[in-house]
Amino acid sequence: MSNKHMKPTGFEDITSDRISSLPDEILLHIMSFMTAREAVQTCVLSTRWRYIWLCLRCLNTEICQFTSKKIFVRFMDNILLRRGFVPLDSFSLIGWRDDVSLNHPRTNLWVCHAIRSNVRVLQIFEYHGLFDLDHSFFISSHLKILNLRCVSTTALFIEKLFSGCPVLEELSMVDCRVFATKFSSSTLKKLTFISHTPHGEDCVHDDFEDLVIDTPSLVSLHLEDLPLLNPCLVNVSSVVNASFRLDEESFASSDVNCNIISALSNVTKLKLYFGLHNIGASGLPLKTDNLESKATNISFNCEHLKKVKIRCPRGDKRAQNIVNVILANAISPPEIVIDQHTPWE
């Protein structure tokens, strides 16, 4: 008898479509690892799958999957209209392409829709240009994590964000242009702030200002590339992991001395990266006196400090200054690693 006339065995009959027989909750969990476009495409598999995507609680849209901005905008409008305000766990907009960006009048409306759907994790990643994010609809008692990349915001946005989102715990702003000099939150536990300064230009501030971080619940802090901003840490004794990447401008003259070490009394892991913008003929930093004069007067409690990593240009005197301060204040010497590199590394 030919194979085409043979009946399926009992095992084949049972396993023919095990995935479709799974409960909706499991199918939705599987689909949460797909992009929104891939998840919608499952509706053609069978009648079982036709409407499952409407209940997705994770929407991850990547612009690179669309051939034009017009098609992308139409897709986003349709999917949000069809699903209504089904609660969202996460919502992501990711722009990977040069010719299709997130800068469209309707993008802020999609973000507003996500917030009104009680989204808990919100991600907006632009890679070409800067996306102007509207602050007016950031009022949510559900938003816990906000990740932004290449986004332009104002000081008012930061203020409204912390006051309007009372349970926000994680904020990441990478390559963002932020016209703000104060981050104040009683709930924030993790803060990453990497400023937008391509090729040393497009500085956020015209004059030197203090960047005040007042976050009593903060556990993890990462600051990087802050032009004309002097980090001033207030109420950060709960931080246990800290990482700073600062150049010479970060230690320029200011009304408030840089206290990135003395304020972190309970830190256990500390990473310091010193950049180098001005290179002399010998390849050494031109400015170290300001840091040295401040470092010699620092006194702080670092009884919990266990590991320190310092990455700096080869021959940079600032590294030894920091080491001297730490050793002078540590109850037990922590593990200290100094990673020196040449300017072109």
PLM region descriptions:
Residues 2-187, 194-196, 326, ...:
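Leucine-rich repeat
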Residues 243-249, 257-266, 271-272:
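Segments adjacent to and within acyl-thioester-processing domains across lipid
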Residues 108-113, 134-141, 159-166, 180-189, ...:
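A structural signal for leucine-rich repeat
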